[in-house]
Curated annotation (Swiss-Prot):
The C-terminal domain of this protein is probably involved in association of subunits consequent on ribitol binding. Residues 1-61 form the HTH lacI-type domain. SUPFAM superfamilies: lambda repressor-like DNA-binding domains, Periplasmic binding protein-like I. This is Ribitol operon repressor. InterPro entries: Cro/C1-type_HTH, HTH_LacI, Lambda_DNA-bd_dom_sf, Peripla_BP/Lac1_sug-bd_dom, Peripla_BP_I. Gene3D superfamilies: 3.40.50.2300, lambda repressor-like DNA-binding domains. PROSITE patterns: HTH_LACI_1, HTH_LACI_2. It comes from Klebsiella aerogenes (Enterobacter aerogenes).
Amino acid sequence: MKKITIYDLAELSGVSASAVSAILNGNWKKRRISAKLAEKVTRIAEEQGYAINRQASMLRSKKSHVIGMIIPKYDNRYFGSIAERFEEMARERGLLPIITCTRRRPELEIEAVKAMLSWQVDWVVATGATNPDKISALCQQAGVPTVNLDLPGSLSPSVISDNYGGAKALTHKILANSARRRGELAPLTFIGGRRATITPASVYAASTMRIASWGLACRRRIFWLPAIRKATLRTACRSGLAARRRCCRGYLLTRRYPWKGLCAGCRRWV
């Protein structure tokens, strides 16, 4: 079966090949082509099963209309919702989204970004990257703009959550509930993730500030969990929390991984 070309579509539509190309590439408004004609050509192209030659289009426009994103985890609801919304917004703008999971491994992050750049993506979104500045430097060398999401960098624009403000509000709520139920105030036990990352550090700073504002001493009920493997979480929780189970009045956890560790390690008494 003969492959349909732009010239075939032009003959079927009764317009020039350049007009067909402009319509299929989304540039028909700039050429002052009517919406009615654009709709007609698009319909004929769909009926004929025509597929745009992206490589040829990219050579002409120097744009691939592809946007790449790296994320650290697929099984995390936070990153999963980010990926889903990213795809929706990309398609709304006529872009093809490419997403890959790098599992917070620096070598996978760099490998993924290099692969995206080799396919000449127009943008790279680095979500939760371990070294966002290294990714930004690679993209800058290739002339590709990048943005950091979730974890900030210094070489590209960054969009992050207000972990500090959220932790202040949450700590206030937990303390208020504890005082109402027990009739007295008591410090919380803080269980954080990796201490060097921005989210646990911000949450810890905000929570200790809020606890102090209630007139409570910030006792050393602080546990940093060095890894997210279940065995590590279970061991850390058993050794650090079992001795305090009688006096603990509440917990403040940064993410779901410490919560999994708390449940796995302290199942006997939680």
